[in-house]
Amino acid sequence: MLDEYNDKYYGKLAERAVAIKADGCLMAKNIADWKADIEKHWPEVVVKSVKVPDSSKRALRFGEPFKVEVKLECGSLRPEDIAMEVVFGSRKGGRMEDVLFTRQMEMKSFARGVATFSGEFDIRYAGALDYAIRMYPANPLIASKQESGFVRYI
Protein backbone atom coordinates (compact mmCIF):
# COMPACT_ATOMS: atom_id res chain seq x y z
CA MET A 1 0.00 0.00 0.00
CA LEU A 2 2.80 2.39 0.90
CA ASP A 3 4.71 1.49 -2.27
CA GLU A 4 1.59 2.12 -4.36
CA TYR A 5 1.11 5.55 -2.76
CA ASN A 6 4.78 6.34 -3.32
CA ASP A 7 4.59 5.29 -6.99
CA LYS A 8 1.34 7.13 -7.62
CA TYR A 9 2.14 10.42 -5.87
CA TYR A 10 5.54 11.00 -4.28
CA GLY A 11 7.59 9.45 -7.09
CA LYS A 12 5.89 11.63 -9.71
CA LEU A 13 6.31 14.74 -7.56
CA ALA A 14 10.01 14.04 -7.10
CA GLU A 15 10.50 13.56 -10.86
CA ARG A 16 8.64 16.80 -11.55
CA ALA A 17 10.74 18.71 -9.02
CA VAL A 18 13.92 17.57 -10.78
CA ALA A 19 12.51 18.55 -14.20
CA ILE A 20 11.39 21.99 -13.00
CA LYS A 21 14.84 22.77 -11.56
CA ALA A 22 16.83 21.50 -14.56
CA ASP A 23 18.63 23.90 -16.92
CA GLY A 24 18.48 26.83 -14.52
CA CYS A 25 14.76 26.33 -13.84
CA LEU A 26 13.91 26.67 -17.55
CA MET A 27 10.69 24.65 -17.21
CA ALA A 28 9.53 26.84 -14.31
CA LYS A 29 10.23 29.97 -16.36
CA ASN A 30 8.35 28.56 -19.36
CA ILE A 31 5.36 27.71 -17.18
CA ALA A 32 5.39 31.20 -15.61
CA ASP A 33 5.53 32.87 -19.04
CA TRP A 34 2.68 30.69 -20.31
CA LYS A 35 0.54 31.42 -17.23
CA ALA A 36 1.09 35.16 -17.66
CA ASP A 37 0.00 34.89 -21.30
CA ILE A 38 -3.09 32.89 -20.30
CA GLU A 39 -4.00 35.38 -17.58
CA LYS A 40 -3.72 38.25 -20.05
CA HIS A 41 -5.62 36.64 -22.94
CA TRP A 42 -8.09 34.18 -21.34
CA PRO A 43 -10.88 36.82 -21.25
CA GLU A 44 -10.61 37.04 -25.06
CA VAL A 45 -11.86 33.45 -25.48
CA VAL A 46 -15.50 33.68 -26.57
CA VAL A 47 -17.99 30.85 -27.01
CA LYS A 48 -19.51 31.25 -30.49
CA SER A 49 -21.85 28.21 -30.47
CA VAL A 50 -22.68 25.06 -28.54
CA LYS A 51 -24.51 22.04 -29.96
CA VAL A 52 -25.58 19.43 -27.39
CA PRO A 53 -28.60 17.22 -26.66
CA ASP A 54 -31.25 19.03 -24.62
CA SER A 55 -31.36 16.95 -21.44
CA SER A 56 -34.09 19.19 -20.00
CA LYS A 57 -36.53 17.76 -22.57
CA ARG A 58 -35.38 14.13 -22.47
CA ALA A 59 -33.02 12.26 -20.19
CA LEU A 60 -29.74 10.93 -21.53
CA ARG A 61 -30.17 7.20 -22.10
CA PHE A 62 -27.84 4.26 -21.57
CA GLY A 63 -26.08 3.24 -24.80
CA GLU A 64 -27.05 6.35 -26.73
CA PRO A 65 -24.37 8.45 -28.37
CA PHE A 66 -23.88 11.88 -26.85
CA LYS A 67 -22.72 14.34 -29.52
CA VAL A 68 -21.25 17.73 -28.68
CA GLU A 69 -19.71 20.55 -30.69
CA VAL A 70 -18.38 23.86 -29.37
CA LYS A 71 -16.98 26.72 -31.45
CA LEU A 72 -14.64 29.12 -29.69
CA GLU A 73 -13.16 32.39 -30.83
CA CYS A 74 -9.63 32.06 -29.42
CA GLY A 75 -8.55 35.69 -29.40
CA SER A 76 -4.76 35.90 -29.09
CA LEU A 77 -4.42 32.34 -27.77
CA ARG A 78 -3.51 29.31 -29.84
CA PRO A 79 -6.22 26.61 -29.97
CA GLU A 80 -3.79 24.13 -28.41
CA ASP A 81 -3.72 26.38 -25.32
CA ILE A 82 -7.37 25.46 -24.75
CA ALA A 83 -8.88 22.13 -23.73
CA MET A 84 -12.55 21.18 -23.59
CA GLU A 85 -14.24 18.32 -21.79
CA VAL A 86 -17.71 17.10 -20.91
CA VAL A 87 -18.39 16.24 -17.28
CA PHE A 88 -21.14 13.68 -16.72
CA GLY A 89 -22.79 13.21 -13.34
CA SER A 90 -25.84 11.88 -11.59
CA ARG A 91 -28.80 14.23 -11.52
CA LYS A 92 -30.61 14.80 -8.24
CA GLY A 93 -33.11 17.53 -7.58
CA GLY A 94 -32.57 19.14 -10.97
CA ARG A 95 -28.81 19.51 -10.61
CA MET A 96 -25.64 17.49 -10.99
CA GLU A 97 -24.60 15.95 -7.70
CA ASP A 98 -21.76 13.49 -8.23
CA VAL A 99 -19.31 13.44 -11.13
CA LEU A 100 -19.31 9.95 -12.68
CA PHE A 101 -16.90 10.45 -15.58
CA THR A 102 -15.41 13.03 -17.92
CA ARG A 103 -14.68 12.82 -21.64
CA GLN A 104 -12.16 14.94 -23.49
CA MET A 105 -13.30 16.77 -26.61
CA GLU A 106 -10.99 16.99 -29.64
CA MET A 107 -10.11 20.09 -31.58
CA LYS A 108 -11.33 19.27 -35.10
CA SER A 109 -10.56 22.48 -36.95
CA PHE A 110 -9.20 25.99 -36.63
CA ALA A 111 -9.96 28.70 -39.17
CA ARG A 112 -10.03 32.49 -38.96
CA GLY A 113 -9.48 32.47 -35.19
CA VAL A 114 -12.32 30.02 -34.48
CA ALA A 115 -11.57 26.56 -33.08
CA THR A 116 -14.15 23.77 -33.34
CA PHE A 117 -14.09 21.18 -30.57
CA SER A 118 -16.27 18.08 -30.76
CA GLY A 119 -16.84 14.65 -29.36
CA GLU A 120 -19.16 11.67 -29.49
CA PHE A 121 -19.43 9.47 -26.42
CA ASP A 122 -21.65 6.49 -25.64
CA ILE A 123 -23.52 6.79 -22.37
CA ARG A 124 -22.50 3.77 -20.25
CA TYR A 125 -24.32 4.61 -17.02
CA ALA A 126 -27.95 3.95 -16.19
CA GLY A 127 -30.06 6.46 -14.29
CA ALA A 128 -30.70 10.16 -14.51
CA LEU A 129 -27.56 11.84 -15.89
CA ASP A 130 -26.68 15.44 -16.40
CA TYR A 131 -23.65 17.03 -18.01
CA ALA A 132 -21.63 20.22 -18.10
CA ILE A 133 -19.01 21.44 -20.54
CA ARG A 134 -15.87 23.01 -19.21
CA MET A 135 -12.89 24.62 -20.85
CA TYR A 136 -9.52 25.26 -19.31
CA PRO A 137 -6.03 26.31 -20.34
CA ALA A 138 -3.97 23.35 -21.53
CA ASN A 139 -0.23 22.89 -21.42
CA PRO A 140 1.70 19.62 -21.09
CA LEU A 141 4.06 21.31 -18.62
CA ILE A 142 1.46 22.01 -15.92
CA ALA A 143 0.66 19.41 -13.27
CA SER A 144 -3.14 19.55 -13.50
CA LYS A 145 -5.90 21.22 -15.48
CA GLN A 146 -6.93 23.23 -12.41
CA GLU A 147 -3.44 24.66 -11.87
CA SER A 148 -4.08 27.76 -13.97
CA GLY A 149 -7.18 28.77 -12.01
CA PHE A 150 -9.06 29.58 -15.21
CA VAL A 151 -11.48 26.65 -15.53
CA ARG A 152 -14.68 27.95 -17.11
CA TYR A 153 -18.02 26.14 -17.41
CA ILE A 154 -20.12 26.93 -20.46
Please annotate each region the language model reported:
Residues 125, 136-147:
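Short acidic/polar inter-strand loop motif in beta-rich domains
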Residues 95-110:
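Solvent-exposed serine/threonine-rich low-complexity stretches and specific carbohydrate-binding patches
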Residues 75, 120-128:
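Short, surface-exposed loop/turn segments at beta-strand-coil junctions that are enriched for proline
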Residues 67, 128-132:
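Short, conserved beta-strand segments of beta-strand-rich sandwich/propeller modules, principally
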Residues 69-73, 85-87, 120, 134-136:
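Residue-level recognition of well-ordered beta-strand positions that form the cores
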Residues 1-81, 139:
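C-terminal amphipathic helix plus adjacent low-complexity
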Residues 108-120:
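Aromatic sugar-binding surface patches on proteins
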